[in-house]
Each structure stands twice: as C-alpha cells, then as structure tokens.
Amino acid sequence: MPVNEYGQMIGEPVDDTPGVLPSLVRIEGQYTILEALSVEKHAEDLLAVYGPDSPRDMWTYLFQPPVENLEELIVALKQMIERKDRFYYAIMDKVTGKALGTFSLMRIDQANRVIEVGAVTFSPALKQTRMGTEAHYLLARYVFEELNYRRYEWKCDALNLPSRKAAERLGFIYEGTFRQAIIYKGRTRDTDWMSMIDKDWPRVKSRFEAWLSPDNFDENGEQLKSFREC
C-alpha cells in the first residue's frame, strides 16, 4: 500500500485514460451472437420475449411492463434504441438466427472507467443455458478487453433473488444494499450492488471458458461440471 509524504496510506497509482464508449459491434461466440438491437431485424422475434405470451413473473422486477402486440413493441424498441445513455444488444441464437433476449450497457462513467450491464430481458430459452452464459461472457470480455473499463456493475432489486444468484454465479461480487434507493411500480426498492473488477477478470474469464467448452457437455447437452466447479 503506497504512503504519501504525510505518512497516510493512499490508493495504488492507476492509468487515468478514460473508458471507450460502446460501439455496438457484432460479437460472435460459439453459441450466440450479440449485435446492435434493430427494430427491422429483431422485433418479430422479440415479441415472444416482450409480448403477452411471455411469463408474467419475469416482469415483476423489470421497470417496464410487457407489451400487448407488435406495434407496442416497435414503439418500445425504438425508444430503447434512441436512448443516448444506454447501448442495447440483441442476443441471437447462432444456429437459428433468432433473437432470444436483450441487455444493455448503461450508467457509463468513462472518467472512472465504470460501466453497468442492465435491462437484462431473457426468454426462458436463454436462462440457465450455454447461450445465456456465453452472452454474458462475450459482453464482459468486450467491457474489459476492448473498452478498457476497470469496474463492471450489476444491480437488482434486493428481493430479486434469481438475479442476484445469476450475478454471483457469473463472477460478480456482492458489495452491499442501498436502502430505499428507488421508487418503481408504486413500491419501494432496496438495490443490491454487485461488481466485477479488472483484477477479477482473468480468473472469471478462465472459468467462463472452461464451462463453455464443448468438452464440458455430454451428448445430451448436460454439463459435466457446474460453473462454480470450473
């Protein structure tokens, strides 16, 4: 730990080059493809994710409600795409080419190189699958290795236990709860904060790659080792 001329402990020196804004480049993995959200390309597929046939319980902790039809979805997607403070990706099944979900990079602090993944909206076909896990791997790799961020955040309603469990499985570390941080849907929300930092990334990356390896799955697609065991 460095000490200044007054005998006080201070933080380690760090390169203060700002982080790079996302450019929504296409990112291709073994099972999934991330690409810029597009009304023309993705709206029809995403109606199954955002529409009236989506599981009702998936909307409890999301800020927006489901849409009722394609026209409403087109309006919602246009609003998402037009936001200047968020960068939305569609998550594609590499085999079928269909969009199965979306997430965004948001709350971007370039000066301090801090960025958050949020607005995670996955269909059941993505949750707890190789595709869903790889989507998060591809985005984290992009954040740390291409955009040069030091801190990658995940936040959720403190009552949203599946979200917190997912974050911790993926390598995010719980840091604390901000009490009464948000009012939404007419109710209060305590917010759990979790993060992954650049020093964590090499270890987490190795775990992602070991778990995602085809050698980790049998002929029926069942994992041989859990993510935590890799």
Label each residue range with its predicted role:
Residues 166-167, 194:
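Conserved active-site tyrosine of GNAT-family acetyltransferases
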Residues 145-155:
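Conserved GNAT acetyl-CoA-binding A-motif
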Residues 173-187:
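Conserved catalytic-core motifs of GNAT/GCN5-like acyltransferases
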Residues 154-163:
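Conserved beta-strand-loop-alpha-helix junction that forms the acyl-donor binding cleft
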Residues 132:
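Glycine-rich acyl-CoA binding loop
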Residues 1-129, 142, 146, 187-230:
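GNAT-family acyltransferases
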